[in-house]
Amino acid sequence: MIAPTTRKDLMIINMGPHHPSMHGVLRLIITLDGEDVIDCEPILGYLHRGMEKIAENRTILQYLPYVTRWDYLATMFTEAISVNGPEQLGNIQVPKRASYIRTIMLELSRIASHLLWLGPFMADIGAQTPFFYIFREREFIYDLFEAATGMRMMHNFFRIGGIAADLPHGWIDKCLDFCDYFLRGVVEYQKLITRNPIFLERVEGVGIIGAEEALNWGLSGPMLRASGIQWDLRKMDHYECYDEFDWEVQWQKEGDSLARYLVRISEMTESIKIIQQALERIPGGPFENLEIRRFDRIKDTEWNDFEYRFISKKPSPTFELSKQELYVRVEAPKGELGIFLIGDQSVFPWRWKIRPPGFINLQILSQLVKRMKLADIMTILGSIDIIMGEVDR
């Protein structure tokens, strides 16, 4: 009888860019020794669209529809960062009512993003049932978005100095009803997932990142807070009206995939607390700063020339960005989302540098998966939470 021969040389396989667990067009070139991962090389750029260069040839208002295509599952945050920069450059004050509505929309968007992280993450490690549950809750959030902004995704709702439109009649009551309903849903998720022994076997102790290591890699968001660092830009930078609400920064110290799951689950509960307080205290008044109309440069224009404006929905004014540099950031669901903006006394920005959290957080993937099993790649990649539209830009 001929004895079976075994291969001892390494195997190189490709995961993606069309693999359903890649969360977009991400390609991983993986070197395996049996089931053990020896090396992992991420290949990026399949979804590069030149977003930074496009910004240099658009006014801020013209560019707003583009920014919703970065992280297309949390578009309120990309809109917020795009109007916060010009507001700070022009020293434009946002009315209190507009700031409250912005905060509500941002936190709803955070919950929707975390939900759409949770479902595919569970599906990646073999649990199909939660995937269908999260879409039920997510649809309720999108119904609220549709009622307030007219769009379920790609909302184009934020404006320089405020928002595009006020909340419709009855929207606040609907949102409060959703908050009460969703808090019960989070308890259901925790019963279904958090104490599940199979789930714990797949995530506990997998992909551990220490606190110092997380800081050295420049990680942010749940990736950083799950490693024991209590850092949240909503507390640190005091933007919008987060200081007026009672809420806590959610963090864990273990630094593994389970800790990152627990941080995101807890953040959804904290977001509901913020939304409930904002809805109960929301003030009256205007939803946009009418004073910014003085920046507008109205000219006598001829039909269809470059400066012509069609008479339709009244846009925010186009004004010159002063000649200075500015870095603005917000706490997005995936981490610190920032832009480095350089004005040049023109209606177009001279430079618009995007700091995407997913791109920075993804850099540590190669180190995390080494010496792990092949099946652990999906767990670790899923716990990072990336969107390739934001990573490649």
Curated annotation (Swiss-Prot):
Subcellular location: Plastid, Chloroplast thylakoid membrane
HAMAP family named in the record: NDH1_NuoD
InterPro entries named among the record's database cross-references: NADH_Q_OxRdtase_suD, NADH_UbQ_OxRdtase_49kDa_CS, NDH1_su_D/H, NiFe-Hase_large
GO cellular component, as recorded: chloroplast thylakoid membrane
Catalysed reactions listed for this entry: a plastoquinone + NADH + (n+1) H(+)(in) = a plastoquinol + NAD(+) + n H(+)(out); a plastoquinone + NADPH + (n+1) H(+)(in) = a plastoquinol + NADP(+) + n H(+)(out)
Job description of the protein: NDH shuttles electrons from NAD(P)H:plastoquinone, via FMN and iron-sulfur (Fe-S) centers, to quinones in the photosynthetic chain and possibly in a chloroplast respiratory chain. The immediate electron acceptor for the enzyme in this species is believed to be plastoquinone. Couples the redox reaction to proton translocation, and thus conserves the redox energy in a proton gradient.
Membrane-protein topology: Peripheral membrane protein
Its EC number(s): 7.1.1.-
UniProt-listed PANTHER family: NADH DEHYDROGENASE [UBIQUINONE] IRON-SULFUR PROTEIN 2, MITOCHONDRIAL, NADH-UBIQUINONE OXIDOREDUCTASE 49 KDA SUBUNIT
Oligomeric and partner information: NDH is composed of at least 16 different subunits, 5 of which are encoded in the nucleus.
Keywords: Chloroplast, Membrane, NAD, NADP, Plastid, Plastoquinone, Quinone, Thylakoid, Translocase, Transport
Alphabetized SUPFAM superfamilies for the sequence: HydB/Nqo4-like (SSF56762)
Top-rank taxon: Eukaryota
Gene Ontology molecular-function annotations: NAD binding; oxidoreductase activity, acting on NAD(P)H, quinone or similar compound as acceptor; quinone binding
Organism in which the protein naturally occurs: Jasminum nudiflorum (Winter jasmine)
GO biological process annotation, one example: photosynthesis, light reaction
Identification of the protein by name: NAD(P)H-quinone oxidoreductase subunit H, chloroplastic
PROSITE patterns named in the record: COMPLEX1_49K (PS00535)
Gene name linked to the record: ndhH
Entry's family note: Belongs to the complex I 49 kDa subunit family.
